[in-house]
């Protein structure tokens, strides 16, 4: 029986990697070895940045809340502490949305936090 060298399997494997590398710059979408390296890096970046995205959004929300809180005469930490004392459970995402889109509602929350801090 003749030896099977696996040409079909190898071609399929290479084709799959090159298909994943479609749109990459330069040799990274043409040459198998560089494409394979770039695809591996891309998977790593995607995995890493799915986690980084959560941290980035939390930072953005805190920055927005802090800016709005300072417009109401409080720091971010004072506002959050005051809201906790007032037993108002609003997450940072919603607070940031209120700060940007509904200043009156945010001011009401800030006033409630101030009232609890004063006691």
Curated annotation (Swiss-Prot):
The lineage of its organism: Bacteria, Bacillati, Bacillota, Bacilli, Lactobacillales. Keywords: Ribonucleoprotein, Ribosomal protein, RNA-binding, rRNA-binding. Binds directly to 23S ribosomal RNA and is necessary for the in vitro assembly process of the 50S ribosomal subunit. It is not involved in the protein synthesizing functions of that subunit. GO terms for cellular component: ribonucleoprotein complex; ribosome. The keyword RNA-binding applies. InterPro entries: Ribosomal_bL20 (IPR005813), RIBOSOMAL_L20_CS (IPR049946), Ribosomal_protein_bL20_C (IPR035566). One of its GO terms (molecular function) is rRNA binding. The keyword RNA-binding applies. This is Large ribosomal subunit protein bL20. One of its GO terms (biological process) is ribosomal large subunit assembly. Belongs to the bacterial ribosomal protein bL20 family.
């Amino acid at each position: 029986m003749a030896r099977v060298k696996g040409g079909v399997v190898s071609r399929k494997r290479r084709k799959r990697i090159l298909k994943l590398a479609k749109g990459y710059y330069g040799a990274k979408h043409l040459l198998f070895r560089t494409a394979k390296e770039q695809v591996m890096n891309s998977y790593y970046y995607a995995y890493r940045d799915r986690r980084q995205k959560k941290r980035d959004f939390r930072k953005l929300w805190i920055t927005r809340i802090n800016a709005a809180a300072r417009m109401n005469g409080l720091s971010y930490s004072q506002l959050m502490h005051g809201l906790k004392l007032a037993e108002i459970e609003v997450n940072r995402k919603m607070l940031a949305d209120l700060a940007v889109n509904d200043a009156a509602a945010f001011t009401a929350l800030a006033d409630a936090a101030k009232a609890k801090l004063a006691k």
